[in-house]
Amino acid sequence: MTKRQNRMVLVALLVIGVSLAGYLGLKAFNENLLYFLSPTDVTKGRAPKDKDFRLGGMIVKDSIKHDGIKVVFDVTDYSNTFRVNYSGILPDLFKEGQGVITTGSLVDGVFMATEVLAKHDENYMPPEVADALEKAKNKQ
C-alpha cells in the first residue's frame, strides 16, 4: 500500500475507535443515570419501571416505624405522600420533619430504598425537589 492508503486506513481506524469509545461512554452514562423524583412525580406515574431512581422530600411526622433493622416511613412534598421501606442503618440526621433523599425502586407500589441520605441544610436538597416542595407548600 502507498503512504496515502496507509494514512487513510489509519484515519478510518482512528475515527471508528473514537466513535466506539464515545458510544460506550454514553451507554455507560445512561445506564448509571438515576432520575430524581418527588412523591408527586411518582404518584403521577413518572417513575422508571424496573430501574432505580431517587425519591426526595420531607419525612412525615409520626410516620417512622422501626422493626429491628427494618424501617418504614413516609416521604412527602406537601402535595403527595409516598411510603418507603428501608433495611439498614439510618444516618444520624434522619428524623421526622427533616429532608431525605432515598435511592431505590418501586416494588408493588412501595418504594424499596437501598440508600437513605438525610438532608442537613437547604444546600443539600437538589433544586428540583426544593422547587417541588416550595410549590406544594405555597398551594396549602
UniProtKB/Swiss-Prot annotation:
Topology feature Periplasmic, residues: 29-140
Subcellular location: Cell inner membrane
Ranges facing Cytoplasmic side: 1-7
Protein residues bound to heme: H120, Y124
TM ranges: 8-28
GO cellular component, one term: plasma membrane
Main localization, broad class: membrane
Gene3D superfamilies: Nucleic acid-binding proteins
Role this protein plays: Heme chaperone required for the biogenesis of c-type cytochromes. Transiently binds heme delivered by CcmC and transfers the heme to apo-cytochromes in a process facilitated by CcmF and CcmH.
Record protein name field: Cytochrome c-type biogenesis protein CcmE
Species per Swiss-Prot/TrEMBL record: Vesicomyosocius okutanii subsp. Calyptogena okutanii (strain HA)
Gene that encodes the chain: ccmE
